[in-house]
Regions:
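Short beta-strand-to-loop acidic/aromatic patch adjacent to the donor-nucleotide binding site
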Residues: 87-98
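Short beta-strand/loop segment that forms part of the nucleotide-sugar
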Residues: 35-45, 65-67
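Active-site nucleotide-sugar/metal-binding loop of Leloir-type enzymes
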Residues: 79-89
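Acidic donor-binding loop at a coil-to-helix junction in glycosyltransferase catalytic cores
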Residues: 174-180
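Catalytic beta-strand/loop signature of glycosyltransferases that borders the donor
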Residues: 123, 178, 192-198, 203
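A conserved acidic beta->alpha catalytic loop
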Residues: 42-52, 71, 94
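Short, acidic, metal-binding catalytic loop of nucleotide-sugar glycosyltransferases
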Residues: 23-35
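Flexible acidic/His/Gly-enriched loops in nucleotide-sugar-dependent glycosyltransferase catalytic domains
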Residues: 68-79, 104-166, 205, 210-233, ...
């Protein structure tokens, strides 16, 4: 069993899927910590990513899964890749993101080993071309995470212990990540934060958050954000005890 499973949900990405994956594998070649495998859950209807993985499996240990279920739903694809991962630590990485620190996996393992945490976030930056980066960010737990105020980052900034993994709620699209973070904190407490910048989020028009439907805005003293009101209504029912309890987490009591 590998120490780390790098979990990558994939799809065609309008013809750029293999290019983005190749960038990830370039970063994995350079990692100082090499006790890992790669798990891919592929929503593609064609076999381009399958063929790429078959070829590169000569160099890397890869578990490839063709996932025909719920195509187009990121949460379902992430769940599939986590469900089939065998590593002690699961490192999530979205297909269009990439490593920018050759010690990323080493630092993630160290984060778990030295803190005894169950899950963690790490710093991230942004890129448009996969080379130059800008706007470095250190994750921060803020108020109203459940409602979509996200200063933590995307799932690409997350690593969790396999034995404590939870699955994403496939009823959600826009708030699927922050609702997942909320449940993880309820169950396992605050995540450990690694301030180092380990990955870059690729900015482009096809990014998931760029193609979502919004119909409402939540106001906050430090800024507002767009949401889907139906998802907010759903969360108010699903997590009614949290709202009744003045939005307090167990580790705050």
């Amino acid at each position: 069993m590998p120490e780390i499973s790098v979990c990558i949900p994939t799809y065609e990405f309008k013809g750029k899927g293999v290019k983005y994956l190749a960038d990830i594998f370039d970063g994995l070649r350079k990692q100082t910590f090499q006790d890992f495998d790669i798990v891919i859950s592929d929503h593609s209807e064609d076999d381009v990513i399958h063929d790429f993985c078959e070829e590169i499996s000569k160099e890397f240990s890869i578990i490839y899964l063709k996932n025909p279920n719920d195509r187009g739903f990121q949460g379902s694809n992430i769940n599939c890749v986590m469900e089939n991962a065998e590593g002690r630590i699961l490192k999530l990485l979205m297909q269009d993101d990439l490593f920018v620190d050759d010690k990323a996996l080493e630092k993630i393992k160290k984060g778990f080993d030295e803190t005894n945490c169950k899950w963690l976030f790490h710093g991230f930056t942004h890129t448009t071309d996969g080379i130059e980066t800008h706007r470095d960010c250190v994750p921060n737990w803020c108020d109203m995470v459940l409602e979509g105020r996200n200063l933590l980052g995307s799932p690409s900034c997350v690593a969790i212990l396999n034995k404590t993994k939870m699955y994403l709620d496939t009823n959600l699209k826009l708030l699927v990540d922050t609702e997942f973070y909320h449940r993880m904190r309820i169950e396992y407490g605050m995540p450990h934060i690694i301030p180092d910048i380990l990955i870059a989020n690729r900015e482009h028009e096809n990014r998931t958050s760029s193609v979502m439907s919004y119909d409402s805005r939540i106001e906050h003293p430090e800024g507002s954000w767009l949401v889907d009101s139906k998802e907010i209504d759903y969360l108010m029912v699903k997590h009614k005890d949290f709202f009744i309890n003045d939005k307090r987490y167990p580790d705050e009591n």
